[in-house]
Structures are given as structure tokens and as C-alpha cells.
């Protein structure tokens, strides 16, 4: 099991069943990001740029820039996450079994991770330009037993999977495994990893499942604002090495995000637009 020394995660308790984003983040739109200084803008849009100065010259930085869209491409992706009368973004439905899952034609992306990894906060950040979107959260962390579906117009669907770990429902595997195996329109699975904890044994079980089913997936490091740069760099390098040596279906570049500071959110939006086929980027690998 991989272990990275980092700051202890801050404990967060969710006290209500339904959290509704009342207003968007002040940096939710590219136009506001462009008002920042060049250094702050680069740090926000491409979080790995903050870590580059700490790397030895012999380290290959290209592996962290495989997906590196331009500012204009980030702007284009933002339109996909901006609602309009003809492009409605909202919570659609929930399901507890495969026979309850809606039949949809558009591509899907699903988000998975351990309980309290920051999944709901990340989804709210992605949808921050659509503040009316409802992200449902269990009163007791780790006890969500439903797959929650969010439709982004006719472009794609985002699926919020139940959290796993020692507090997860026992029927997690019975619920999630059939979805991963049978959902033919699943374009990409996003596996969230807490920056303060690194890959845990339960995460490795999920990785084994993705590899067994040959499902394309990507690692997303959450809560990077709570971790020292040295520890974050060590984790990023270890994850990149893990991906290279122990996986075949994982995208080679881990993504770094902070839902609080909004770091990496625009980049992740653009990647989602890319893998769902809604934005074709030049010279980018998927």
C-alpha cells in the first residue's frame, strides 16, 4: 500500500441532507480568473506549475502536462458548464440498483472515492456556474446508498457514486460493480484521492476493479490546499510512478484540485469536455 507523509486531514461533518450552492465561487468563471496576476492565474488553472520549481532537472515534467489546454480551450469548455434555456444543468434522478438506473444515450462520467474525500464539494465546484444544481449529501458521512445522476444539457451525464471505505454501506460492491461493467456509455471514471492521505488500500481495490474491467479512469487529488507543497509534490510523483508501473487503463497524468481555492477546477472541466467528445483539443492525449 502506498503511503505519503502529509498533513492530517481536517475533519468535516455534514449536518444536513441537502446542500444547495447559493452562489457561485468568485473564481468560477475564466473572465474573473483572468483578472488575477499571471502567477496566480497559472497556479489556479494549472496547479502543477506551483510544484515545478521544486523538481530536480532530471525529472520528466512532461508527464504532468500531457493534458495542458490553452486559455481559449478552457474558455470553450466553460460554456459546457454554463446553463441556459436550451442547455439545462440539473440533478436528474437517483438509483439504488441497476434496474433503477435511467437509460440515457449521452456519454457519462462518474466520480468515485473514499468517504469524506471531498467528492460532493468537487461536484459543486464543477457546477458552480449553475448554482441551482442540488448536490445531495447523506446526514452521516459514508452512508450514501444511491447513485446520483446530473444531466448537463444533452451533452453528458455526471454520476455521483456512493463513497466507500470502513463507513460505506456493505452493498457498495453489489451496487457499483454492475454499473461499471454494464454501463456502455461510461466515458471515464474519476477516482478521487485525498491529498493528505494518498492512495489507501480501499482505493487500490477500486483500481483493481477498473483494471479488471479495462475501464478508462483518471486519478484526481483533492484538498490540495490542506497539504504542504513538499508533501503534495511527493504524492504527485508517487502517483505518476504508480500509474506508469502498475496500471494500464489509467490516464498517465494525475489532476490536482482544491474546491476551496478553485485550483484545477477549470482544467478538470476541460478534461471532462474532452473525454465526453464535446471538445476536440489539438495534440492532447486521452
Swiss-Prot record:
Xref: CDD domains: YihA_EngB
Binding site for Mg(2+): 120, 144
GO molecular-function terms, A-Z: GTP binding; metal ion binding
Cofactor(s) in the UniProt record: Mg(2+)
Superkingdom as given in the UniProt entry: Eukaryota
GO CC term, one of those recorded: mitochondrion
Xref: InterPro entries: EngB_GTPase, G_ENGB_dom, GTP-bd, GTP-bd_ribosome_bio_YsxC, P-loop_NTPase
Signal peptide positions (record): none
Domain EngB-type G per the UniProt entry, residue ranges: 105-278
Keywords: GTP-binding, Magnesium, Metal-binding, Nucleotide-binding
Residues involved in GTP binding: 113-120, 142-146, 160-163, 222-225, 257-259
Family: Belongs to the TRAFAC class TrmE-Era-EngA-EngB-Septin-like GTPase superfamily. EngB GTPase family.
Listed name of the protein: GTP-binding protein 8
Gene that this sequence comes from: gtpbp8
